[in-house]
Amino acid sequence: MKLDDYQKTIVYVLYKEDNHTEELPIHDGAVRWLKQNMVITETTNQYMVSDLNNAVFPFMLNPWVVDAMQNDEELVNEFEKAYKKMESKYNKMISNRY
């Protein structure tokens, strides 16, 4: 399965959480793709949302993903590299606005 840098960033952020869980935007295509490919799953069936246009929902990494990352340091490094690349890109975008 081939992931782009944004999808790798989402997976890396979830992996770094102690419980591998985080709120993610439900209208995001990358989140939807990761869910449909069983990389992530929702942690509940119902969740209070205050802004339907920017709704978030708690997702977690599926256990097979956690196992794969715990047993493959190169994979973790690859995802961390994608995370840092996306973080740098985001920071440049923000700094150019102001």
Please give the residue ranges for each predicted region.
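Short, amphipathic alpha-helical interaction segments positioned at domain boundaries
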Residues: 51-98
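Basic amphipathic alpha-helical segments that dock to polyanions
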Residues: 25-47
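Sequence-level detector for tyrosine residue identity
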Residues: 6, 12-15, 47, 83, ...
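Generic preference for hydrophobic/aromatic residues in regular secondary structure cores
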Residues: 19-24, 40, 58-59
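Acidic-enriched, low-complexity/disordered segments with a strong bias for Aspartate over Glutamate
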Residues: 4-5, 18, 28, 42, ...
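Short acidic, hydrophobic short linear motifs in intrinsically disordered regions
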Residues: 5-32
